[in-house]
């Protein structure tokens, strides 16, 4: 698979997604072997890029999924554990990977260059 560099393509659209992230609390009074963290809601930008396609007289369906800009973040992982009825138990996992995938859709034949959307969707993958 080839790696696509989104910065070389034109931007078709932008949108915002809200996610909850854990942030450590510095200087919190907690026992020595524990860490205190707060869950904070943040906005991330989702960008759709345009992929220019040269003139073509042949039908060339292009379907691909390419990982772009992977990064490692701590994530809250749900845990099946006995808890009181109105509570949920979760653990912090340091090995969750957020991978942005660029999906290239099939293209139809036209007599002029077309633009195919590349949509970057954050996905959490546990390793």
UniProtKB/Swiss-Prot annotation:
For the modification Pyrrolidone carboxylic acid, the affected residues are 1
Keyword field contains Repeat: yes
Q: Does the keyword Disulfide bond apply?
A: no
Keywords per UniProt: Cuticle, Pyrrolidone carboxylic acid, Repeat
Q: Where are sequence repeat segments found?
A: 31-39, 84-92
| Superkingdom of source | Eukaryota
Recall the GO molecular function terms of this protein's record: pseudouridylate synthase activity; structural constituent of cuticle
Protein name (Swiss-Prot/TrEMBL): Cuticle protein 4
Organism expressing this protein natively: Blaberus craniifer (Death's head cockroach)
């Amino acid at each position: 698979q080839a790696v696509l560099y989104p910065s070389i393509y034109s931007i078709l659209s932008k949108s915002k997604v809200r996610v909850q992230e854990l942030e450590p609390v510095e200087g919190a009074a907690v026992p020595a072997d524990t860490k205190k963290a707060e869950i904070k809601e943040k906005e991330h930008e989702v960008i759709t890029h345009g992929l220019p396609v040269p003139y073509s007289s042949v039908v060339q369906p292009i379907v691909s999924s390419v990982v772009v800009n992977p990064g490692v973040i701590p994530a809250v992982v749900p845990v099946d554990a006995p808890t009181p009825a109105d509570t949920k138990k979760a653990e912090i996992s340091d090995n969750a990977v957020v991978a942005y995938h660029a999906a290239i859709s099939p293209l139809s034949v036209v007599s002029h260059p077309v633009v195919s959307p590349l949509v970057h969707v954050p996905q959490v993958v546990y390793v």
